[in-house]
Curated annotation (Swiss-Prot):
EC number of the protein: 2.4.2.60
Anything else known: Plant silencing THI1 exhibit reduced levels of thiamine and decreased resistance to the bacterial pathogen Xanthomonas oryzae pv oryzae and the fungal pathogen Magnaporthe oryzae.
Keywords, sorted A to Z: Chloroplast, Iron, Metal-binding, NAD, Plant defense, Plastid, Thiamine biosynthesis, Transferase, Transit peptide
GO terms for MF: cysteine-dependent adenosine diphosphate thiazole synthase activity; iron ion binding; protein domain specific binding; protein homodimerization activity
Organism: Oryza sativa subsp. japonica (Rice)
Descriptive protein name: Thiamine thiazole synthase, chloroplastic
Length: 355
């Protein structure tokens, strides 16, 4: 009961259900102020202060070089051991993959491993279109930005983040602060684990090793088992749509027709609608959906990436038998958690215990 109630409390603080969160549930540092022309922009307050040390006479605490090596190695190897068998593996840390992992991380009972072949996660979400800075997000995906506390300039049907990196860095920092998540960047997924017609994990290797198989002798991979794999590998390219391409190679799907020409208004709705479990054990999200279904590309608008990622997370939660927004069990869990005869909630809602 305690675990169920904690999960309900955590997952209900989501924009996925479609209703605007009350102000108290949003980032407390975010305020709303009118802008010229009637537009609204979330503004983040900040304060300046003197650093708590003398910048003219700074001296760091002494350390042995071997300690640094041991700390990095021990912690990384511990993570590899911990996540060798995990609940969900998210392949690809672009806007859809990060949104998916963030949503999953709200359930503290679900362990999430995010695998990204690049040193720098974020995919194409560090910039808008044509290497411009601003990110356009169509409504109602701005509710997800409200939840994260990302500032934006509000227009009638869309919002604009002044720099795409604000979204990517915020969702990433919020995600990585959760104790049930580990990001393995500079790691490539080379294959899938498939048993009896069900995807059961991924085959991994260092990204630089994966890129140099033709220049060295055999360099065998590692593996990571999981109950669910979420493939968010993006559209076609050297590392794009690799999940669905591999499914085609091994005969689990018939074809990967590729995405159609750009149509923003059709594309975003289609991407979210078609986000699903394409074969047992594997959910496809983001632009990889367009590759497998021949949906239009959307170009430089990012709302569908966020909402598709959230939907993929709730599909994964459903597959795990956890409260989710797909079958409405989040609301049922919340209703049970609301009865004082069943649970006691701490004042700050951080812990819930059996009554």
């Amino acid at each position: 009961m305690a675990a169920m109630a904690t999960t309900a409390s955590s997952l209900l603080k989501t924009s996925f259900a479609g209703a605007r969160l009350p102000a108290a549930a949003r980032n407390p540092t975010v305020s709303v102020a009118p802008r010229t022309g009637g537009a609204i922009c979330n503004s983040i307050s900040s304060s300046s202060s003197t650093p708590p040390y003398d910048l003219n006479a700074i001296r760091f605490s002494p350390i042995k070089e071997s300690i640094v090596s041991r700390e990095m190695t021990r912690r990384y190897m511990t993570d590899m051991i911990t996540y060798a068998d995990t609940d969900v593996v998210v392949v690809g840390a672009g806007s859809a993959g990060l949104s998916c992992a963030y949503e999953l991380s709200k359930d503290p009972s679900v362990s999430v491993a995010v695998i990204e072949q690049s040193v720098s996660p974020g995919g194409g979400a560090w910039l808008g279109g044509q290497l411009f800075s601003a990110m356009v997000v169509r409504k109602p995906a701005h509710l997800f930005l409200d939840e994260l506390g990302v500032a934006y300039d509000e227009q009638e049907d869309y919002v604009v983040i002044k720099h795409a990196a604000l979204f990517t860095s915020t969702v990433m920092s919020r995600l990585l602060a959760r104790p049930n998540v580990k990001l393995f960047n500079a790691v490539a997924v080379e294959d899938l684990i498939v048993k009896e017609g069900r995807v059961g994990g991924v085959v991994t290797n260092w990204a630089l090793v994966s890129m140099n198989h033709d220049t060295q002798s055999c360099m065998d991979p590692n593996v990571m088992e999981s109950r669910v794999v979420v493939s968010s590998c993006g559209h076609d390219g050297p590392f794009g749509a690799t999940g669905v391409k591999r499914l085609q190679d091994i005969g689990m799907i018939d074809a990967v027709p590729g995405m159609r020409a750009l149509d923003m208004n059709t594309a975003e709705d289609e991407i979210v609608r078609l986000t699903r479990e394409v074969v047992p054990g594997m959910i496809v999200t983001g632009m990889e959906v367009a590759e497998i279904d021949g949906a239009p590309r959307m170009g430089p608008t990012f709302g569908a990436m966020m909402i598709s990622g959230q939907k993929a997370a709730h599909l994964a939660l459903k597959a795990l038998g956890r409260p989710n927004a797909i079958d409405g069990t989040i609301k049922k869990a919340a209703a049970a958690a609301a009865h004082p005869e069943l649970i006691l909630a701490s004042k700050d809602d951080g812990e819930i215990v059996d009554a």
